[in-house]
Amino acid sequence: MSYWKRIELKNIDIIKEKSLEFLKMHTPYMMKESFKGAFISLAPYRFLQKTPEIAESLEEHGLFPEDANIYVMWNNKDSVVHKDYTDSIGRINIPLLNCEGTYTTFYENVHSRRLVLPTGAPFFMTTNKDYIEVDRVEIMQPTIIKVCDGHNVLMDETKVPRITLTLTCTPDAGLLLDD
């Protein structure tokens, strides 16, 4: 199974524009002062209900959005090698801001234990250092990434914040990694 796969989504420019506008107008996450952790749920803001273009675009792939989160970074220390705490194989990441020259990297030999971020999001923190990078992708368009394996984000720290929208779908978007 591949670690990532780019996909085409119709209305991607509208999705990106509405997502950024939503974050600016309805959340504090564009400001560094509000930073408590990189992975932030948009469920309390009813984001998916306010951006129907996401569901319309995913429907063409036989997918239905279940959850929307953002991954916000201000520097490379904001992300570490980890596995997402989820039953999902993959999520769809959509670049929203300052993603040029940044990479999602994938690793083998990752050992981990469950932790909870200050944002309340659980994840699997890596407990070893002898993991091996096996792949990487620049998130420049909607991309399914394999979140059940070890991964990390490396960013260009001169362009902040770096923000991706990350979508959990039914059926699992990770199943498309084999196509």
What are these regions (language model features)?
Residues 4, 67-68, 78, 89-93, ...:
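Extracellular structured ligand-interaction cores
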Residues 11, 96-98, 169-171:
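Non-catalytic surface loops within mature trypsin-like serine protease
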Residues 60-64, 82-86, 134-136, 155-158:
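A general structural signal for short secondary-structure junctions and capping/turn motifs
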Residues 60-61, 104-107, 176-179:
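Short, charged, solvent-exposed linker or helix-capping segments at domain edges/interfaces
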Residues 73-143:
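Catalytic core of non-heme Fe(II) oxygenases with the double-stranded beta-helix
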Residues 116-179:
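Catalytic core of Fe(II)/2-oxoglutarate
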